[in-house]
Swiss-Prot record:
Protein's name according to its UniProt entry: Motile sperm domain-containing protein 1
Gene field: Mospd1
Keyword hit for Nucleus: no
Annotated compartments: Endoplasmic reticulum membrane; Golgi apparatus membrane
This protein's GO CC annotations: cytoplasm; endoplasmic reticulum membrane; Golgi membrane; nucleus; perinuclear region of cytoplasm
Pfam families: Motile_Sperm
Domain MSP: 16-143
Higher taxonomy: Eukaryota, Metazoa, Chordata, Craniata, Vertebrata
């Protein structure tokens, strides 16, 4: 006798539930957002029953709060905010979707969706923009602090002008003095004693400046 193949028993509460979106945001100044849609997907090979629960049911109207989803199908659940008041701004409410097999009452899985009422979409965008600017400024400050020691290390050495003047003064001291007839250096490169004294003085100043850096 052929025995019918039985479906393995599912463990209560462990079945993944697929819902989109997972967050609902209602804007007080935009009536088009006061009614939103949750889509419940059933990727399984058996039908599912579902039920929608809410932490604050007096604030919302849920159309088709209970029903069934055929195998590998989806169903839309319409949620409407009916208590749009400033005292509810920023309050986080929760919806819970529970699913079970049609032939059983125990919940096989559940998924929570949060809902928030905000005063304005523009205000929300402004807050997000301010947050991005603060993050950018924080990153900029961090970047400057990271580079600052390196910049100080680079600027701590002698400048190119200082090095150039030092080389010129050394070269001037090595040139022959006026009246030195045995030198092979052209006469126009011969320096007077006073000129060499000036070069030596400047070289001394440069040396002191380099030692202080």
């Amino acid at each position: 006798m052929h025995q019918q193949k039985r479906q393995p028993e599912l463990v209560e509460g462990n079945l993944p539930v697929f819902v989109f979106p997972t967050e609902l945001i209602f804007y007080a100044d935009d009536q088009s957002t006061h009614k939103q849609v949750l889509t419940l997907y059933n990727p399984y090979e058996f039908a599912l029953k579902f039920k929608v629960l809410c932490t604050t049911p007096n604030k919302y109207v849920v159309i088709d709060a209970a029903g069934a989803v055929k195998p590998q199908c989806c169903v839309d659940i319409v949620i409407r905010h009916r208590d749009v008041r400033s005292c509810h701004y920023g309050v986080i409410d929760k919806f819970r979707l529970q699913v079970s097999e049609q032939s059983q009452r125990k919940a096989l899985g559940r998924k929570e969706v949060i809902a928030t009422l905000l005063p304005s979409a523009k205000e929300q965008q402004k807050e997000e923009e301010e947050k991005r600017i603060k993050e950018h400024l924080t990153e900029s400050v961090f970047f400057e602090q990271s580079c600052q020691p390196e910049n100080r290390a680079v600027s701590s050495g002698p400048s190119l002008l200082t090095v150039f003047l030092g080389v010129v003064c050394i070269a001037a001291l090595m040139l022959p003095t006026l009246g030195d007839m045995e030198s092979l250096v052209p006469l126009y490169l011969h320096l007077s004693v006073n000129q060499k004294l000036v070069a030596a003085y400047i070289l001394g100043l440069i040396t002191m400046a380099i030692l202080r850096t």
